[in-house]
Amino acid sequence: DEFIEANSESVIASLAYWCSALQPLERQRILGCYSTDFELNVSIVTFNYTTLLPRLFHAFGTSDHATPEDSWGVSSIRLIHLVQAHGALGREPICGVNDASQIGSDALSKNEDIASTFVKGEIQKLFGSVDDRRAEDIILGANVLIIFGLSLGETDIRWWESVVKLLKKGDIHFVLIASTKAVSARRSPASFRRFSKALKEKLLTRGGANDDEKRLLSERIFIIPAGSIFRFKSHIPDAD
C-alpha cells in the first residue's frame, strides 16, 4: 500500500547508518577489521508478530541498493533474510517464557502440558517450527549484530545466550545496542559511562557470561541511538 511504498526505501536504507552512529574510536575498531566501502548484507531477526517488517522487506527487494551519502564506509546494502523468530499473527505466534523455571509455581512448572503451552522453545517444538533455529543461525553468523527495540528481558534469555556465543567466536564480531536513552545518557561522560556499563552488564549477565568474559566481551559492545536506524518518512496510518 502507499505507506509501505513510501517508507520501504528509507527504513531499510537507514540500516546503513549504524556505522556513522558510532563514536570515532568505536568506528575505527570495527572498520579496522573490514575493508571500507563494503557491501552491507543484512539479515533481520524480528520478535514482532505483525506483517510490517516482512512487507517493508519485500518492497525493498533483495537486489543491491545504493546507500545514503553519509552512511560512512558502506557502499551498498542488500537484504538477505528475514525471520520472525517467534512466529507471526497468521501462523502460530509464540508467546511465553524462556524456560520452565520462569513459571511462578513449582507444580505448574513440572507439568508437561503447561510447559508445552508457555515455554517458547517447547511450543515451537510442538508446532514443528524452525523459526528459532533459523534465527539462531543468523545471529551466530553475523559480523555486526544490532539489537533494536528489545528490553533484554528474562523471557528471551536463549537469544542473549546466542549473542554471547557470537561475541565469543572472536575479535571480529561486534554487538551494537540501539537504545532510545542513548542520547539523553550522553549529557555527561559520567552518566553515559554508567548507562553503557549497566546495559552491557545486563546483556552479558542474561547471556551467561562470567566476570572474566564480561570484561573482554564488553569491549566489543557499543551503544548507539535508536533513532539512527529504522527511519520512517511517515507515521503508520490509523485504522479507519
Give the positions of each predicted feature.
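SIR2/sirtuin-family catalytic core signature
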Residues: V42, G73, D131-D240
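Extended, H/D-rich, highly charged conserved domains that either
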Residues: D1-V130
